């Protein structure tokens, strides 16, 4: 009789029983004859191993440090999701006991320090290590907590050296310490093709070798161990038969989920191969992306069955009759480790989308990648003898950096990389559509995932690991609204793309919509200004509530509408008024009363109409998380006012650091009450007085117009106090 148990733990210098590293189909007979009570206990979300207790104590210690650190705001999403449940009255917590002191054995154990989590300069103290924990029986009835899970797809592990693979295993073990368990899908395909590789001796041997290699590496760092799962997947002939937002491809389904849940419950990392069994119990190769989607549907409690074109919750099909939604793991992250890195962007100097709001950007990015793929295909046809590296920069990286690594083969990697990026984008988008809005995706290179937060020696400089940073902050390493430096330009570089952080996100509404009419233009007879309170596309009461909440002051709506009437450039709304911006066209005081020439309304670059950011607001509940600020800012500076905008903020405003990082320049206005910011280039440019009928002024610089406008804006607040916005 075979029973799924923990794999041996060697990473912490602690001995456990040496058990099998692989699953076994004979266990199916046990599951089928088990009673409902046994199955319910088997699938329960209550961790019973001592290793899980130690990980829980570590997490409790970490959350205490975060709550007391200056970086608490950045980590509040992590604290909200992963903070351990408060103990019931009369129940003693293990954390205070663990806080009493660190034993000499644990302090000197190199395995404990190598798996510590470096929180970086943002969190103090920067490193925590393990502390002694009393080995007492775990009381299941008092320790219920949800199990958080990340699903990881590792592409081409055969091309990774042992050091990189070990770094990935270390990172996954650190994520487990932080409360996020992992399951891994291996993708050993050397190239993208419509035809799947056949299950022959050589291919299966390679799969097993890489799986055994990774499982052994995981066991070195993850105390509960790792387990190779071989018999959990089945394949049907159904393909794209169900019209739904959740697309089914290839008919891959989880048939034996009892092989997955017990290891995950015990903190063991399951490693799944892209192999399934058809109705004749014959092994068939399947796409790793389809395996990822099948696992996501399983963990989300969705089974794909064609029944009059609808999805039904199927429990019997996967042996989970007693596994309710409360007992399933919470799938928080979809992680793709690909040598190509993040999703490329032709519009960013660093070459990649660092944050993708799928709700608003998916279609545009998909079209961009399809164009890149078509261009790469045309180039390959016209220049068949030319090296890939001389063409598309993505293909150049694949040829020079990936194909030359151990086990690689150049002819295997001849397909254009944009198609692989498109598949990565597609699988994450499909996954996040069926997961809660709090779930997210991350696409990065295996090398970045293996980055050590704690260096091997004192001479090395600590560096942030993108996976750990994202887990703690729910943000990308680099803000997507930051301007990119020309020095980091991707074109001409063979480096892989920076990581891409993806969220299901929120819709973005722009009135008027520049995607239909182009960038915003000054008002004219043919292009009148919109009226905020009267435009049917705008819910002004909600907009007013957003401003009041964000500024913590009540807006004098009537006075404000009177002030901006006839000069509204546009409005941006993120989600259900979670964030937004109101932009206006302002005229310098020195030009008021002067007849505005007709050509001034045809361009945003005139002395009569200065593009001005009048209000930038984000709900307090959405500040510091979710990327709402970045979403609104990107729409403002890249779509609404791509040629530049000016605004002001009170000098004491703590948000000014955020503004400064995103502006081209900043200057304190006379009186030290206001600070002026702008994103325009060439603010010293002078408009010709004769060309623009400036009269006595003869000429005017952008700088002079900006200062004039920012000095002349009068706040509109109901409290009547003429203090700064």
From Swiss-Prot:
N-acetyltransferase domain mapped to chain residues: 527-702
Main enzyme class: transferase
Record flagged with keyword Transferase: yes
GO MF terms held by the record: L-glutamate N-acetyltransferase activity
Cell compartments where the protein resides: Mitochondrion
Ranges of biased composition (kind: Basic and acidic residues): 51-91, 451-461
GO biological process terms held by the UniProt record: L-arginine biosynthetic process; ornithine biosynthetic process
Pathway: Amino-acid biosynthesis; L-arginine biosynthesis; N(2)-acetyl-L-ornithine from L-glutamate: step 1/4
Cellular component GO terms, alphabetical: mitochondrial matrix
Transit peptide stretch: 1-46
Catalytically driven reaction(s): L-glutamate + acetyl-CoA = N-acetyl-L-glutamate + CoA + H(+)
Region (Disordered): 38-119, 451-479, 502-531
Keywords carried by this UniProt record: Acyltransferase, Amino-acid biosynthesis, Mitochondrion, Transferase, Transit peptide
Pfam families in the cross-refs: NAT
Domain of life: Eukaryota
EC number: 2.3.1.1
Function noted in UniProt: N-acetylglutamate synthase involved in arginine biosynthesis.
Family in the record: Belongs to the acetyltransferase family.
Protein's name according to its UniProt entry: Amino-acid acetyltransferase, mitochondrial
Source species: Phaeosphaeria nodorum (strain SN15 / ATCC MYA-4574 / FGSC 10173)
Designated gene of the protein: ARG2
